[in-house]
């Protein structure tokens, strides 16, 4: 955990030319969470059972135990990766968050070092905003950048008249979950996979 001078840390709107840097930072964070989430899903009893059934059927078709064992695992991994990366905002991140009240900000240290980001998207009820794309550069994690971004986000949402914040995070993102709980966010739902929660929904009134 690096020591940082909070007086040198600021948050501002992302510039168009900074989009590639932010996208790489998001991808780096995704890889960590994505791999842990896939491992979590693959080791659930129901997933193991389904893959075992699929492997048994493929053995008779392919006449190869090793190939029949590998194919269901590979198909599951590919399917999960496609599902996790199905996000329209990542294709054109700058233009997407330049429409209406959507916003994306970067945390900048020492004037030019981009060390984090967070995005805002209003929900359909116009009372709540969704916190999205919150990420901290690997070198700056656990140094207070995430807390700084979260406070900035909440302050902005309040000034714009929103009454609540909703966000979604993977169950394997322990550091993020800890941060949100410490800042007053409550679990209000989630997404399930074969009966297991893989994404938690958090909400907070502001």
Curated annotation (Swiss-Prot):
One of its GO terms (molecular function) is N-acetyltransferase activity. The chain crosses the membrane at residues 37-57, 60-80. Pfam families: Acetyltransf_1. Probable acetyltransferase. Its EC number is 2.3.1.-. It comes from Xenopus tropicalis (Western clawed frog). GO terms for cellular component: membrane. It is an enzyme of class 2 (transferase). This is Probable N-acetyltransferase 14. Keywords: Acyltransferase, Membrane, Transferase, Transmembrane, Transmembrane helix.
